[in-house]
Structure formats: structure tokens, C-alpha cells
A protein has these predicted regions:
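Karyopherin-beta/Importin-beta family HEAT-repeat alpha-solenoid scaffold
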Residues: 1-418
């Protein structure tokens, strides 16, 4: 009660600060965001605080500060996002999602993306399934229409495409209602994603050499899958086929580029292949714990492996594509985590280990990190499989005691004497 006697008057005073008190109002936005949890317990005080933050968003545009540009969203945007997450049900009941029209293209993109994520959480907290579907579609429609128009335009700028993908991602990542509300019905994000699938495919073809666009596109895929979880299954086959085809085409273009460089002709640009491999890892994360999905995922890993092996044929190739090396071996490690039996009993494991032995000769921190991580996971999975089967462990593993902290070398001299 004593806190209430201080917090409520402080918030009321903050909301009445004059517009020209810029520094005080910015700190007021921080105060409101800090007490989002308190506001949830006192819903009658939410509306004036929200109105204050909306005014602050518009003021930041009209009266930019002389300070160095913030790398993240403004204080008002972060506070408003915090309120959306903490007070989602209350704001959903007040139809707060309508404020989208006030902020789109009227505030800096970072602020807009932050608030869109919050609005996604508000939509997910709606009382009925129909309201969640309607709200998700309302939030996604403007960037979806803009992205479709850009996909058909010959003069589309990659940055403009990336911005629309960012907006869609912001909506999809938080618009996930509870399983009780879904009750077996289609996930609202999946419906939006499925309707946009032809547009996504067109963008991936049209902008295949743009690292910015492909990375943003795959990030959108990732958050759609994470939001839908198991509800993404109807799109899984199309997703894996698309990722594999994009990876194969990119590898073919990269190999053609290497050949053209050798014969002195012009180098052809290729897509950021690691983004497609990372998305395949997300497929494993979301569906690798279901036994019936293992054959499908193993087929995906096999296809990804063949494509990567076609490009990574020497230490020089490993050094040229360190991001692909890192993501590929993390993909293989993740499959071992979820489905060890399929890979340990497959000839594919030998090919991966052979590729890893080549990668160990590359002096690149990120690439080596992925290769070494896989080697460690593979060893651990193999030992665990042997223990479960009851077969004897190799002498090197059964006789030596595990290394202790005290056994670690403490100086270069210790290493030289070892």
C-alpha cells in the first residue's frame, strides 16, 4: 500500500509533464516501462500512460535529439513494448491494436518494429480465437501487401524489401496464442505465412544475391516456425524443399563463380548460404523430438550435406566460406542431439567426419568452433550409444580417468613439457 501511495502519483505526474520538458519526459517513459508489472495490477492507470508514450513516440520524430543515435528503439518505444507484453489482455480488451495505423511509417523503423512485437503479444492475448486471427491479419496485411508489390517490381531496392520482412517478422514472433485458445485450429501465423509463401519464394529468387534480403527472409522463416511450433507441420515439406533448393542453387552459383575467377572471367555473386542451413537447424529443433519426423529430417540433413560437400572440397574452400562451415557442423550437431541413432548408424557420418578432418586444418575461429563442437558432440553420442548397447568401450575410454581441473596446463612451459 505504501508503494501505491508513491507510484500512482508519480505516474500521474509523469503523464502531465509539459511537452517541452524533453529530458524529463524521456525519463518518464523509462519510469512507465519499469512499472509495467505494477500497471498490470492497476488497469485503470494504463490508458493515460499509454497515451503519454504514444505522444512521446511522435515527439521523438518532430524533435530529434542531438545525442548520438541510439542503436536500439527509443525509450518510449521500449516502454510501450513492455506495457504490451505485461498488460496484453487489458490492452487487447481495449482494442489497442488499432494504434498500428498511428505508428506505421510515422516513427523510426526501430521504434515501429519494437511496438509491432508488442502489438503481436496484445493480439495473442485476445479473448477469442477469431479475434486473434483478425488481429494477426490486420497487423500483417500492410507489410504483406508491400512485400508482394516489391516482389513484382523490377526496380525494388533490397533495403526496402528487408524493411517489410522485418515488419512481418516482428508481427509473427509474438502473435502466438495459447494452446487452449487454439484448441486444434490452425495457427494464425501459419495462415498468414501460407498465404505469403508464393511471395517469399519470389523474393528468394529475385533477391538471391542480396545477403541483406536473404538473411532477413530466413530470419522471418525462423520466427514463423518458432511461433507456430508443431502447428507449422503443414508447411514443413515445402519449407525444407525450398531451403534445400535454394542452398543447391547457391552452391552451384558459388562453384561457377570459383571457376570463372580461375579462367579470368567475371565473378558471379552467390547467396549467403549459411542462412538456409541455419533454417534447416530450426526445423530440427522444432520437429526433431518426434520419432515419425526423423526420416524426413534425416533426408533433409543428407541433402544439405551433399550440397555443402560439393562446395567444401579443400581447406581453401573452408576458409572462403567460414559461415557455411560453422552453420553446417552446428546443423549436424543438432541432429545428433535430437536423432543420434539415425546418424550414428548411417554412412553419412563417415563423410561428415572426413569433412571435419579437412575443416580442422583451417585457421578460422568461427569455422573451427563449429567443427570442434560437432566432433565433441559426435564423440559423446557415440560413447552414450555404446554404453546403452552394453558393448565394451574402447581401451582409451575405459582405462583413463577423465581430466580434472588440476590437470590443465597453467603456462606455456607446462604445454611444452607435456
Amino acid at each position: 500500500h505504501s508503494d501505491n501511495n508513491v507510484i500512482e502519483p508519480a505516474l500521474q505526474l509523469t503523464c502531465t509533464l509539459p511537452q517541452d520538458w524533453r529530458r524529463a519526459r524521456r525519463q518518464g517513459a523509462v519510469l512507465i516501462g519499469s512499472y509495467a508489472k505494477w500497471l498490470q495490477r492497476h488497469p485503470t492507470t494504463i490508458q493515460p500512460c499509454v497515451q503519454f508514450l504514444l505522444e512521446e513516440l511522435s515527439c521523438e520524430v518532430r524533435q530529434p535529439t542531438r545525442r548520438r543515435r541510439e542503436p536500439s528503439a527509443s525509450r518510449a518505444a521500449r516502454a510501450l513494448t513492455a506495457l504490451c507484453h505485461r498488460c496484453a489482455a487489458e490492452l487487447a480488451a481495449a482494442n489497442f491494436v488499432q494504434v498500428r495505423d498511428q505508428i506505421v511509417n510515422n516513427v523510426p523503423l526501430k521504434d515501429e518494429l519494437s511496438v509491432l512485437e508488442g502489438l503481436g503479444a496484445v493480439v495473442a492475448a485476445s479473448a477469442t480465437y477469431e479475434a486473434v486471427v483478425q488481429g494477426t491479419q490486420m497487423l500483417a496485411r500492410p507489410p504483406a501487401e508491400a512485400l508482394a508489390a516489391l516482389a513484382q517490381s523490377d526496380g525494388a531496392e533490397p533495403r526496402a524489401v528487408a524493411h517489410e520482412l522485418d515488419r512481418l517478422t516482428a508481427v509473427m514472433r509474438c502473435a502466438s496464442p495459447s494452446s487452449q485458445l487454439l484448441n486444434g485450429r490452425p495457427h494464425p501465423v501459419l495462415e498468414v505465412f501460407a498465404n505469403l509463401w508464393p511471395v517469399f519464394e519470389a523474393v528468394s529468387i529475385k533477391m538471391k544475391t542480396s545477403h541483406l534480403v536473404i538473411e532477413k527472409l530466413c530470419r522471418c522463416y525462423k520466427h514463423a516456425m518458432r511461433s507456430c511450433r508443431k502447428h507449422f507441420e503443414p508447411m514443413l515439406d515445402r519449407m525444407t524443399a525450398h531451403l534445400i533448393k535454394s542452398l543447391q542453387d547457391g552452391v552451384q552459383a558459388a562453384n561457377a563463380g570459383q571457376i570463372s575467377v580461375q579462367d579470368g572471367s567475371r565473378h558471379s555473386a552467390s547467396a549467403p548460404l549459411s542462412s538456409f542451413v541455419y533454417c534447416c537447424s530450426i526445423c530440427i529443433t522444432e520437429f526433431g523430438d518426434e520419432a515419425r519426423m526423423i526420416p524426413k529430417l534425416f533426408e533433409m540433413v543428407s541433402s544439405v550435406s551433399q550440397a555443402c560437400f560439393a562446395l567444401l572440397q579443400s581447406p581453401a574452400h573452408f576458409a572462403e566460406h567460414p559461415d557455411l562451415v560453422e552453420e553446417y557442423f552446428y546443423l549436424a550437431s543438432r541432429f545428433l542431439d535430437y536423432c543420434p541413432g539415425s546418424l550414428l548408424s548411417s554412412p553419412l557420418l563417415g563423410h561428415i567426419l572426413q569433412s571435419a578432418s579437412t575443416g580442422l586444418r583451417v585457421e578460422h575461429r568461427e569455422a573451427l568452433r563449429g567443427v570442434l563442437h560437432f566432433c565433441g558432440e559426435c564423440t559423446a553420442a557415440a560413447v552414450l550409444a555404446l554404453k546403452k548397447s552394453g558393448d565394451p568401450l574402447p581401451p582409451a575410454m575405459s582405462s583413463d580417468e577423465p581430466l580434472q581441473q588440476r590437470d590443465a596446463p597453467r603456462s606455456q612451459e607446462d604445454v611444452d613439457l607435456a
